[in-house]
Amino acid sequence: MLEIKVPGTSANFGPGFDSLGVALSIYNKFYVEEIESGIYIEGCEEKYRNDKNLFYVSMKKVFDKFGYKLKGLRIKIEGDIPESRGLGSSASCIVGGVMAANDFIGNKLSKEEMLEISTEIEGHPDNVAPAIFGGMTAVVKDKDRIYHDKIDIDKNINFHALIPNFILSTKKSREVLPKTVDYKDAVFNVGRVALMISSLISGKYENLEVAFEDKLHQPYRKELIGNYDDLIVKCKKNGALGVFLSGAGPTIMAITEKHREDFLKNMNEELRILNHKWNIKKLVVDHKGATVISKLNGGI
């Protein structure tokens, strides 16, 4: 039996739309074993316990590519990454499936090749890249090639995920975006993403409130998220260095200095009085990315 651990991710970082992502200390685990026949999946909703399951689909894509003849599979999922909340749950299933299949075929794929296959399934690389490589990643897809690099951000920060009790699909979140943007709005974002990356590396935190501003996606997506503006104000009032929409939402991500232990307590109080139920979870950067945890004797 194979055990795979994949971190959740937060993409976009405000102005870094579709180009930045970070792996965080929230995980999905997948246990996989080959059996004589059939597909058996547990640990997820009934509607995902079939051959349309994203983890299984991702494994099969690798098997088909290499002509691996699969008998049957038993898959168990232990997930802490909430679904459709902007924390990379789909990316974790894709990366986990590709990595598991790679182990089955004798590790014929490099991480770069796993990134290519995962991006082909996901459609864009900003979540799958950090899920594979760990850390904060800048990534660009140009034609058939994916360019990426790790960003060594200052270690003196924590991430706080504000997670609501409602979901928001990526499809719906993309539908509200305009087909074109003003030139001045593009310039607005370019300047801020450069300042944001530089400040996260240098630790010049006073720049971050401005550097996390965005005009390309958050102004449109926030209309789908109850309490959004109120939460941004509350996070900043309680010491957040920067606040941004995690992925397509609806999770909101706040960054604080590590010594600000009061942020978690204060925000828990703030969240209690909102008209939607929100939870807050403190996270740190995961620098390892997806890993094969163990190969165990015996079944699931």
From Swiss-Prot:
Is the keyword Transferase in the record?
yes
Alphabetic keyword roster: Amino-acid biosynthesis, ATP-binding, Cytoplasm, Kinase, Nucleotide-binding, Threonine biosynthesis, Transferase
Gene name in the database record: thrB
Family (UniProt):
Belongs to the GHMP kinase family. Homoserine kinase subfamily.
Q: Spell out the subcellular localization from the entry.
A: Cytoplasm
Q: Record's PANTHER family?
A: HOMOSERINE KINASE (PTHR20861:SF1), HOMOSERINE/4-DIPHOSPHOCYTIDYL-2-C-METHYL-D-ERYTHRITOL KINASE (PTHR20861)
Keyword Amino-acid biosynthesis found = yes
Q: Which HAMAP family match?
A: Homoser_kinase
Enzyme class, broadest EC rank: transferase
Source organism of this protein record = Clostridium tetani (strain Massachusetts / E88)
Task: Tell me a Gene Ontology molecular-function term this record carries.
Answer: homoserine kinase activity
Pfam families associated with the record: GHMP_kinases_C (PF08544), GHMP_kinases_N (PF00288)
Its cellular-component GO annotations read: cytoplasm
Q: Quote the catalytic activity from the record.
A: L-homoserine + ATP = O-phospho-L-homoserine + ADP + H(+)
Binding positions (ATP): 82-92
Annotated coiled-coil positions are none
The cross-references to NCBIfam families, in alphabetical order and at most eight, read: PRK01212.1-4 (NF002288), thrB (TIGR00191)
User: For this UniProt entry, what is the primary localization, expressed as one broad class?
Assistant: cytoplasm
Give the source's domain of life in one word.
Bacteria
What pathway or pathways are given for this protein in its record?
Answer: Amino-acid biosynthesis; L-threonine biosynthesis; L-threonine from L-aspartate: step 4/5
Q: Write out the function statement from the record.
A: Catalyzes the ATP-dependent phosphorylation of L-homoserine to L-homoserine phosphate.
Q: Which EC number(s) are documented for this chain?
A: 2.7.1.39
Write out the GO biological process terms. Answer: threonine biosynthetic process
> Which protein is depicted?
Homoserine kinase
